[in-house]
Amino acid sequence: MTRDIVIIGGGVIGLAIAVELKLRGAEVTVICRDFQAAAAHAAAGMLAPDAEQITDGAMKSLCWRSRSLYSEWTSKLEDLTGLNTGYWPCGILAPIYEGQESKGVRVQEGEGESPAYWLEKAAIHQYQPGLGEDVVGGWWYPEDAQVNNQALARVLWAAAESLGVELKDGITVEGLLQQQGQVVGVQTNTGIIRAEHYVLATGAWANELLPLPVTPRKGQMLRLRVPESVPELPLKRVLFGKNIYIVPRRERSIIVGATSEDVGFTPHNTPAGIQTLLQGAIRLYPQLQDYPIQEFWWGFRPATPDELPILGTSHCPNLTLATGHYRNGILLAPITAALIADLIVEQKSDPLLSHFHYSRSQKQASTIPMLTHSANFSNGHTKNPPLPTLDSPLIIAGKSFHSRLMTGTGKYRSIEEMQQSVVASGCEIVTVAVRRVQTKTPGHEGLAEALDWSKIWMLPNTAGCQTAEEAIRVARLGREMAKLLGQEDNNFVKLEVIPDPKYLLPDPIGTLQAAEQLVKEGFAVLPYINADPMLAKHLEDVGCATVMPLASPIGSGQGLKTTANIQIIIENAKIPVVVDAGIGAPSEASQAMELGADALLINSAIALAQNPAAMAQAMNLATVAGRLAYLAGRMPMKTYASASSPVTGTIS
C-alpha cells in the first residue's frame, strides 16, 4: 500500500481525495497556493446531472453515482467536524420559455435512471409562484440537489485538518521533478517536497505543471439577500433556466450564476457579465429585481475540450490525475475521491475511469497495441490493425501495463517458438519458473538472452514449491534473478504453493502463510489460488498485489469451470483479479474478461497449440475483445423476442 502521498491542489477535489486517503490509512500532505482562490468558492453548489441534461453516457453514470453518495458523504464530514455542509436535497425545477423545448412526458427506462416530470404552464406556476410570465412549462428533477459550496470547502478543510492531513496553504508549486519515468519531488517556492505518490488536482491551473488540455473558463456570479419584509424563503428549490440558475440558500440568500467566458485568467467582475446575470434572473423570477445585492465574485472553472474530467493514471506510475471537472467539481467530489483512493491504495481501477483517461486527447493513444514487434507466422498471419479502446492501463503494485494478457515460457517445443509467441501475444509480463531456470531444466536454458527484458516485465514464479518455506526461499531467488536482468526495482512474485502432484491444486494455507511473509519483505505478491472468494479476501487483506484464481486445473485446457466463484471474487476484490490456468481457447479467454477480470495469464494453450504464435495472437485479440465487451456493457437478456427492425413507420 502506498502511504506517503502529496496532493497538489487544495480545492474541493484535492481535499476530498485527501480525506478519503487519510481515512484509508495513508499519510497525506496537501499543497495549496491559495485556498480562497479555489473554484469551489466560485460555484453555486448545484448537484444537477439531470437538469444539466448530460448526454455523455459515462459522464452521466459518473455524476449519478456521485450524487447518490452525497447524503452519506456529507453526513460523514459533518460528524468529523461538527460543521454543516448545507446539503439540501431540494430538487431542481427547470422552467422553459416558448419554443425552447417541445412538451411531453419524459419516459426513462432502466435501472439507475433518474425520473423527470413535465409540468404544464398552470402546474408549474402553481408549484412555484412568482415565475416570469414567459414561462410556459418546465421539468421537475426530484433527485437533483444542492450543497453550500463555500461551506463544503470549509468543512473539507476542517475534516482534513482534524484527521491529521498536513495542509500547506500559501505554497506555490513551480514544477514536478521527474527522473526515469517517475515523479521524485515537487519543486515549490519554499523547497522540494517528496513522497511515494503524487496527485495532481490543481483545477484550472493543471496546464501549468503538465501539458494537459485544461483551460480556465471564467464564471461571474452574484448573491442577493431576501428582504426582511418577505417572511418566508420564497424559493424552496433551485431554478435552472436557459444560461441562468437561481439557487436559494436556507439562510435567506440567493445565488445567481453564472457566466461562462473563455478569457483565460482575466480577473474581476464586469458590467456586461453582471448585466447578463441580472437580466436572465429577473426574466425567470421577476421579484428578484427588488432584492438587495450582497456581493459579486468570479472564479475559474477547469475546462477540457470535451467538457469531461481527467481522472486516473498518468505517464508516470506514481502520479495520478484528478482535474478538468469544469462545471461539475462540487458534484463529482465524492466519487472522484473514492475512485482515486481505490486506484492509489488498492490498485483497483474502476472501469468507468477509462472514459476519463488523459490519453483520450492524444490521437496516438486512441488505440490498443496488438503487437509490439513484427512477427512472421508460418500460416501467413500478420499484425492486425489496432482497435479503438475505452480502456485505461492495468495497474499492479503501482506499475502500469497496457496489455492485459500475461504469458509464460514453459512447454514450448523450441526457444524460437517461445520468442515468436511472446511477441505475437503483445504481452508485457512474462512469468518465469525460478527453480527451472536455476536447475537449467530443458526448455529453460538461455531465457536471460532469449527475451528483451528491457521491454518485458519479468514475473518470477515459485512453481515446483510444495511448502510455504520453500516458496519464500525461491521468491527471494527470483528477485535476485530479476535484478541480474536489469530490473533492479522488480519486487513481483507469482506465488505458487502446490503439494498435490496429480491435480496441481494450490495449498490455501501454505499460500496464505507465504504471502504474509513475502508482503512483509516488500514483495508485490501475485498468488495463484483456487477460486475461493474467502481466501481471495484474506490474501487481499494481508497486502497481496493481485489474486490469481484458476479457471480449471493447470494445463488441463478445460476452460472456465469456476465461473460463479470468479464472479464473486471480481465483485468483492479491490485489487486486480487475474484469471490463471485452464483456459484453452480464445473464446474462453474472452469470456473470462467479459466477467470483469482485470487480466489473464495463459501459457499451455499457447505453447501446446499447433501454431503457438498464431494462438498467441488469437489470445491477445480475445483478451482485448473481452475487455472491450465488458467496458461496453452487455445488452440485457430477455425472456421474449424483440424485433431489430421497426414495425411502424416503415416505407411501403
From Swiss-Prot:
Residues holding 1-deoxy-D-xylulose 5-phosphate: 555, 581-582, 603-604
Gene3D superfamilies: Aldolase class I (3.20.20.70), D-Amino Acid Oxidase, subunit A, domain 2 (3.30.9.10), FAD/NAD(P)-binding domain (3.50.50.60)
InterPro entries per record: Aldolase_TIM (IPR013785), FAD-dep_OxRdtase (IPR006076), FAD/NAD-bd_sf (IPR036188), Gly_oxidase_ThiO (IPR012727), Thiazole_synthase_ThiG (IPR033983), ThiG (IPR008867)
ThiO: annotated segments: 1-366
Domain of life where this protein originates: Bacteria
SUPFAM superfamilies, A to Z: FAD-linked reductases, C-terminal domain (SSF54373), FAD/NAD(P)-binding domain (SSF51905), ThiG-like (SSF110399)
Positions with a binding annotation for FAD: 5-19, 44-46, 173, 325-331
Family of this protein: In the N-terminal section; belongs to the DAO family. ThiO subfamily.
Matches recorded under HAMAP family: ThiG (MF_00443)
Protein task: Catalyzes the FAD-dependent oxidative deamination of glycine. Is essential for thiamine biosynthesis since the oxidation of glycine catalyzed by ThiO generates the glycine imine intermediate (dehydroglycine) required for the biosynthesis of the thiazole ring of thiamine pyrophosphate. Catalyzes the rearrangement of 1-deoxy-D-xylulose 5-phosphate (DXP) to produce the thiazole phosphate moiety of thiamine. Sulfur is provided by the thiocarboxylate moiety of the carrier protein ThiS. In vitro, sulfur can be provided by H(2)S.
Protein name: Bifunctional protein ThiO/ThiG
Organism phylogeny: Bacteria, Bacillati, Cyanobacteriota, Cyanophyceae, Nostocales
